[in-house]
Amino acid sequence: MPLEKIPAILLIVLGMHIALTAPTPPTPKSQRRFGDGPVGINWLGGGINLIKANTIATSQIQLKQLTSIKAGYWTCAVAELCIIVAGTMESDSAWSKRVVALLLPNGKHPYCIRLTPTTTLATILVVSGAVIRYWCFREMGRYFTFHITILENHKLVMTGPYSIVRHPSYAGTILMAVGQVIWYTAPGSWLREGIIYQIKLAWLLIIPVILCMFLGLANTPRRMMAEDAMLKKEFGKEWDKWAKAVPYRLFPGIH
């Protein structure tokens, strides 16, 4: 029965919403000890030197863009929930017929929106990634921002997930991105079963999601190196000791 997919849908959309919502308000420039935005890396001279990145391309996605991306996730979730509910109603229900005709223009039965082993795997990946990111939010507190910076009275956080790898929030992001690709392209998903990708208007929702995942994954290595360089510059030997104790950046024993 499609009803069993409802918990998975809610877990996916709530996990993505929480993980993509900044845990702290934007930090005033006066409280930032390093720059007012993203940080780049200058490799000249064989060393890593921090440079302000206000004039270079960066991977920072503005909060307004994240809001539109989250709206896309919620739209897909609500669409699937409506289809599932419509499928449980009497076949002569006018509301059910309208919903199915609108959201499944190819004429498929509402039961096509279902939980499968593939979407179950996707749920596990997305929820795991979201939990990791939320753990990072809680562990870092006010130091976790959606921009790379050093705050006043900044402390080096080395506990919780940061005692396992140095950049656990990015590990969570990668798990979520992989899970999303599987979730939205697997059999049983609305985008696939309803052939929604053939509707031009639907790409207003699809493109921001794809762009978010691509930019996030493509720029993760540079952001990690920038953060390591910035923290090393700020904390010196304390960071060296932590990096020696926690040598992996993303996944223990792998990277």
Task: Annotate each predicted stretch with a short phrase.
Residues M1-M158, L175-H255:
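Membrane-anchoring alpha-helices and their flanking helix-loop junctions
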Residues G160-A171:
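Glycine-rich acyl-CoA binding loop
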